[in-house]
Amino acid sequence: MTEVRWDDIDQRAVDTARVLAADAVEKVGNGHPGTAMSLAPLAYLLYQRVLRHDPADPTWAGRDRFILSVGHSSLTQYVQLYLGGFGLELDDLKALRTWGSLTPGHPEYGHTPGVEFTT
């Protein structure tokens, strides 16, 4: 089995992901931060170390696909897309669950770069 290194910078990134999730839900006044906060280490590990993807070319044919089957935890994916350079900005996270935002309540394929499946 391959050993995965985990440095202080990784822990800080996960802590940041958790805070971003909590702040986004607090700002909009509704949503589900708990799952995004608890899945932050796993999602970070997948996006940063495991999944083959290219944020500059999110439709690259050789990419791995991440399907978030629990759509109400959309922040899990949105935060990783933000941290991973898929084109989401901090203002997009702040606009969570608002009309016309790139961060609707559930991930939507074709709406947010990096989202592979609508859940």
Kindly give the residue locations of the regions a language model identified.
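General secondary-structure edge motif
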Residues: 1, 22-23, 57, 61
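N-terminal capping segment at the start of a domain
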Residues: 16-30
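Short, conserved micro-motifs enriched in small and acidic residues
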Residues: 11-15, 32-37, 71, 119
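Short secondary-structure boundary/capping segments within folded domains
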Residues: 31-34, 56-58
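Cofactor-binding active-site loop characterized by glycine-rich and histidine/acidic residues
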Residues: 7, 39-119
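N-terminal hydrophobic or amphipathic helices/low-complexity stretches enriched
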Residues: 1-19
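Short, flexible active-site loop motifs that bind/organize anionic cofactors or intermediates
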Residues: 4, 32, 83
